[in-house]
């Protein structure tokens, strides 16, 4: 996974202001949500092509803060595959899996100004529910667009009633 991160540094440059750290992959296994943000399970997923090459990585947090809210912490697709439709296909599989496991709402944070990512998540049906920040990330301080997507008949209003921290204007 470290080689994958080093071969695809764009995400890290945009988010952290520098390429992946030498221990970047290891930290994906040890970084946990902050205290006071309960969750049921955290998963690190790798997606491979037919030749066995790692082409994407995702981290998912199940029942994040409240039951049925799942958080996508990371979703990186190999730079060479950008614009090919692979990211949308992989995301569709990931979303289906989360629904099958009980997700009713999905949430994520996108660095404001990361235009490609912002457009991708909007095309996937996510809407901004608030801004958070500035948040220190590596060598940068970023504003985050907190985005959510209701599933299985859920609504954004129901989501915001459950997840107080994502309500506009909350601390």
Task: Place the predicted regions along the sequence by residue.
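Conserved GNAT acetyl-CoA-binding A-motif
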Residues: 98-109
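Helix-turn-helix
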Residues: 117
């Amino acid at each position: 996974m470290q080689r994958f991160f080093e071969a695809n540094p764009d995400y890290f440059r945009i988010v952290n202001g520098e390429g992946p750290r030498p221990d970047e992959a290891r930290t994906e296994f040890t970084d946990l949500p902050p205290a006071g943000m309960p969750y049921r399970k955290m998963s690190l997923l790798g997606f491979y092509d037919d030749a066995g090459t790692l082409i994407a990585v995702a981290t998912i947090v199940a029942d994040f803060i409240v039951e049925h809210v799942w958080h996508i912490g990371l979703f990186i697709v190999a730079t060479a595959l950008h614009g090919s439709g692979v990211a949308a296909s992989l995301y569709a599989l990931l979303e289906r899996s989360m629904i099958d496991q009980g997700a009713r709402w999905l949430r994520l944070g996108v660095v404001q100004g990361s235009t490609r990512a912002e457009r991708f998540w909007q095309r996937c049906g996510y809407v901004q529910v608030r801004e958070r920040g500035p948040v220190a990330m590596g060598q940068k301080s970023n504003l985050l667009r907190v985005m959510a997507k209701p599933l299985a008949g859920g609504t954004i209003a129901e989501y915001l009633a459950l997840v107080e921290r994502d309500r506009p204007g909350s601390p």
